[in-house]
Amino acid sequence: MPNTNSNSYTFAYAAVLTLIVAVALAAAATGLKPIQQQAIDLDKKRSILNAVTNLTDKQQILKDYAEKVTEVVIDQQGNAVEGVKAFDLVLKKAYKKSDSERRLPLYIYNAPEGKKYIVPMHGAGLWDEIWGYIALDQD
């Protein structure tokens, strides 16, 4: 039986316990990554749809987004850009690029009463950053 009152036993015990907890945390973080990404995507879709509707049900949000929202990426002149997914663009990073390289997402909501254009907004507020989505009716 080892001497549990020795310094070497205490350090070895702490090292083994730290290693076990580190492996458990790494496994949990890796295992939960897909679930976290799904939650982030759902929150973004909910935010986009909240500009035009007031949906709270997860299944209804996913259904409406898939059926009624068209994603478009535009350049500074308003021309559609192919090969880039609007949902994956990070607006904060896009604003830091030069005008010629800047690509911006635009979401088109196809409602029964007509199209609505959903534009993401991002900027500086009084205390922190302000971000959200603004919906515009088709004129």
Where are these regions (language model features)?
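Flexible, solvent-exposed loop/hinge segments and secondary-structure transition points
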Residues: 2-139
